[in-house]
Amino acid sequence: LELPNRPTAVFCGNDRTALGCYGALSDLGLRVPDDVAVVGFDNFIDISGGTWPPLTTVQLPHYDMGRWAVEYILSGHAASGEPVQHLATCPLIIRESA
């Protein structure tokens, strides 16, 4: 980020990492989103709802993911190691960081 041709956006693997990114950008004197846009991934509301500016993030279906995990275990697939796939809808939650 200290290079003259720095990135204009950072996509973080989760909202906690995005919070750390906010701090690193601030330490460098950069502003979100004026200098660098930041996007998180999971919509962990304790983080994404409490940042300034509010964090743009991708919503993970946490409840559904938990239900799928329980169904996988109870179905016996987990014991056999048989993989199961689920297609999840993960909407972009647009706030002010990007």
Residue spans of the language-model regions?
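Flexible loop/turn connectors
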Residues: E2-A98
